[in-house]
Curated annotation (Swiss-Prot):
Belongs to the SYCE family. Residues 1-31, 261-313 are annotated as: Disordered. It comes from Macaca fascicularis. Its main location: nucleus. Residues 29-281 form a coiled coil. This is Synaptonemal complex central element protein 1. Homodimer. Found in a complex with SYCP1 and SYCE2. Interacts with SYCP1, SYCE2 and SYCE3. Interacts with SIX6OS1. InterPro entries: SYCE1 (IPR026676). Keywords: Cell cycle, Cell division, Chromosome, Coiled coil, Meiosis, Nucleus. It comes from the Eukaryota. GO terms for cellular component: chromosome; synaptonemal complex. The gene is SYCE1.
Length: 313
């Protein structure tokens, strides 16, 4: 800018030399001032440039440091991302494992619950079976006692002494009925003989006798004798039939007694086996109580009860 002004001033006209010299002096002073100003500006610019260079160097240093730090942070970020990815994968695996464990625990809990229910059902079934066996045993014992009582009554009924007494009583009743029948027959014969003698006698009969024979009292007497004779015959027939029925019943009862005796022997064996199995179930393994066999008096009582049962039937 100062060079262009000097070049423009170097072309003065000849008429203005003096003015030019004056102006040149002024220009020189102004140029000096401008040069000083320019120098000052240049110095300031250089100082500013130097300062700017220093600031730029510091900024570059800071930028490099920040870049390095950024690179470090970026690397750390990548590393942290890798760690996060690994942790997430580990967490996913752990969650899956936890879900599997929970599913397994739920399944085991379900199986355990089913086992408990089955155990409860089996325990209830065992208890019901025990109660059923106990009831069957009690019913069998009651039936056995009843059979023993019937057998005892039958034995009492079929004792030889009692049978002999009953047969003697029947024979005596039969003889008594026969005697009564003979007596009634004799009485009837006498009455008939008297009637015949009265009806066939020669000579006139008295009026009273004729009236008596034709009266209702004579007819009633004859009818009474006939009824007595008929009743005696019926009693005799009933006694004979009763005696025959008693003998048949005695034979039937003896046969039934034999059958019941065989049945009691079979049932005694069954009771023995059932009692032994029940005692084994109640006592448990290793503590089985040996059942007591029936003694001779008990067997005799059993037969007596069976005979009583047959008698009542």
């Amino acid at each position: 800018m100062a060079g262009r002004s000097l070049a423009s001033k170097a072309e003065p006209t000849a008429g203005a030399m003096d003015g030019a010299e004056k102006a040149e002096g002024q220009d020189t002073s102004s140029q000096k001032i401008e040069v000083e100003v320019l120098i000052n500006r240049i110095n300031e610019a250089q100082q500013a440039k130097k300062k700017a260079n220093e600031d730029l160097g510091e900024a570059r240093t800071i930028c490099e440091a920040l870049q390095k730090e950024l690179d470090l942070l970026h690397g750390e970020k990548v590393h942290l991302k890798e760690i996060l990815s690994k942790k997430q994968e580990t967490l996913r695996i752990l969650r899956l494992h936890c879900q599997e464990k929970e599913s397994e625990a739920q399944r085991k809990h379900t199986v355990l619950q089913e086992c408990k229910e089955r155990i409860s059902a089996l325990s209830l079934q065992i208890e019901e079976e025990k109660n059923k066996q106990r009831q069957l045993r009690l019913a069998f014992e009651e039936q056995l006692e009843e059979l023993m009582g019937q057998h005892k009554d039958l034995w009492d009924f079929h004792r030889p002494e009692r049978l002999a007494r009953e047969i003697c009583a029947l024979d005596s009743n039969k003889e008594q009925l026969l005697k009564e029948e003979k007596l009634v027959k004799a009485t009837l014969e006498d009455v008939k003989h008297q009637l015949c003698s009265l009806c066939g006698a020669e000579g006139p009969s008295t009026l009273d006798e004729g009236l008596f024979l034709r009266s209702q009292e004579a007819a009633a007497t004859v009818q009474l004798f006939q009824e007595e004779h008929r009743k005696a015959e019926e009693l005799l027939a009933a006694a004979a039939q009763s005696h025959q029925q008693l003998q048949q019943k005695c034979q039937q009862l003896q046969q039934k007694r034999q059958r019941l005796k065989e049945e009691l022997e079979k049932r005694g064996m069954q009771v023995h086996a059932q009692a032994q199995s029940t005692q084994e179930e109640e006592a448990g393994p290793g503590d089985v109580a040996s059942p007591k066999p029936l003694k001779a008096p008990e067997e005799k009582d059993l037969e007596l009860h069976t005979e009583q049962d047959l008698m009542s039937s």
